[in-house]
């Protein structure tokens, strides 16, 4: 299925506010818009990805996730999903994204991710730590990063273009206020729904079928979405833009959640 032609899901009328291949295919839904902060999917988006993944863990994987999380009582996959943004630093900032040359969405590690310093490399690195015999502390840290980075790579503009820093420098107007395209995709489209992460996760749950994937595949998918004619609006986010891209945004959230579950089940469910 073309991930730019995902059938919309009707929301309730009350809606307001390692080289391993993992699996999943495209899916789902509809949404509206309002611009906000710039930090990957924002809190709500990362929580949705984590909650969708949590619901799809196998018993063995869940037991190992719970064992790792027990080092910090009260933590869940959802609560750790934003840890990497809350503890962000200049050193780790490049691990949240990968930038492509405009017009070329074929991932080349040497060009796009030197020394593994991008979100694709970071996913592989953290997955390797999680699968290793490292200390429980190191594996919990890897889990925190992995939950977050898998969400990041499914936000299209976290695999955007060098020349505008993934849409951060592309200024526009959205709902009578200044913003940038990266912020629109990070949080704006989700925030305008005024749905909790629980409610949005319920809307997205159970709509995907497994299919092979890798972090490289996810990054190239995101880049191709950004490369779609019309993805960059003419400095104004219009209702027609929202109508065209709202299913894409929620489809990426759903893909991120399902793919994260597949990855965790593969690593921890053995």
Describe the role of every protein-language-model region:
Residues 31-32:
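Hydrophobic alpha-helical transmembrane segments of integral membrane proteins
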Residues 35-37:
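N-terminal signal peptide c-region/cleavage motif recognized by signal peptidases
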Residues 3-26:
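Bacterial N-terminal signal peptides that target proteins for export
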Residues 39-149, 156-270:
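N-terminal, motif-rich segments that launch catalysis or mediate targeting to/interaction with membranes
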Residues 1-2, 84:
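Intrinsic-disorder/low-complexity regions
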């Amino acid at each position: 299925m073309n991930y730019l032609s995902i059938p919309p899901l009707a929301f309730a009328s009350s809606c307001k506010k390692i080289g391993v291949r993992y699996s999943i295919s495209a899916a789902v839904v509809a949404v509206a818009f309002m611009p906000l902060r710039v930090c990957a999917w924002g809190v709500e988006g990362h929580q949705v990805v984590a909650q969708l993944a949590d619901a799809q863990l196998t018993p063995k994987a869940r037991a190992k996730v719970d064992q790792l999380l027990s080092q910090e009582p009260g933590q869940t996959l959802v609560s750790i999903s934003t840890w990497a943004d809350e503890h962000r630093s200049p050193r780790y900032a490049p691990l949240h994204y990968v930038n492509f040359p405009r017009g070329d969405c074929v991932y080349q590690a040497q060009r796009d991710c030197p020394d593994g310093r991008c979100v694709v490399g970071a996913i592989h690195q953290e997955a390797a730590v999680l699968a290793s015999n490292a200390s429980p502390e190191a594996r919990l840290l890897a889990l925190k990063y992995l939950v977050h980075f898998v969400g990041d790579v499914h936000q299209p503009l976290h695999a955007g273009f060098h020349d505008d820093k993934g849409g951060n420098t592309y200024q526009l107007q959205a709902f009578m206020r200044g913003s940038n395209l990266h912020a629109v995709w990070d949080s704006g489209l989700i925030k305008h729904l005024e749905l909790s992460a629980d409610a949005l996760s319920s809307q997205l749950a159970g709509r995907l079928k497994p299919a092979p994937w890798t972090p490289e595949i996810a990054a190239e998918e995101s880049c191709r979405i950004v490369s779609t004619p019309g993805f960059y609006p003419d400095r104004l986010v219009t209702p027609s833009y929202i109508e065209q891209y709202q299913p894409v945004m929620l489809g990426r959230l759903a893909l991120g959640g399902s793919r994260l579950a597949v990855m965790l089940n593969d690593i921890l469910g053995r």
